[in-house]
Amino acid sequence: MIIIIKNCDKPLLNFKEMEMQTKCDLELRLLTSSYDSDFHSSLDESSSSEISQPKQESQILTIFYNGHMCVSSDLTHLEANAILSLASRDVEEKSLSLRSSDGSDPPTIPNNSTRFHYQKASMKRSLHSFLQKRSLRIQATSPYHRYR
């Protein structure tokens, strides 16, 4: 699934209009807490040029899924977050089903409490294995171990 959010002067209705649209800002403006000063200065330059544009721009959401394209301009922030959440859940479910079909993973874990239980059991096994190996290393380096 590919999701593209664009700022455009008018809503796009189909793919041909999207190809013909020339005045679109494709930058999502997703910044992390540690971005470099060059990017920050280029962002300031682009935003200063946008100040002269009218503020009538609408948010366009374009979704490519299963070979289909859907373009929408009437989404709220909450609806966009819901779509992204559903998409990430779908991707996670598909990756889990692929791993379980390979036989390399245990069956799908249904909820967080069961997942926590599996993580706790895994941590116990790992700690037990570590302690056994450590005791064997200590015994192997002990001067009295050779004479037993």
UniProtKB/Swiss-Prot annotation:
Family annotation (InterPro entries): TIFY/JAZ (IPR040390), Tify_dom (IPR010399)
Keyword entries, A-Z: Jasmonic acid signaling pathway, Nucleus, Plant defense, Transcription, Transcription regulation, Ubl conjugation
Protein's UniProt name: Protein TIFY 5B
Free-text function comment from the UniProt entry: Repressor of jasmonate responses.
Segments forming domain Tify: 54-89
Transcription keyword on record: yes
Source species of the chain: Arabidopsis thaliana (Mouse-ear cress)
Domain-level remarks: The jas domain (120-144) is required for interaction with COI1.
A GO-annotated cellular component: nucleus
Listed Pfam families: tify
Keyword Magnesium: no
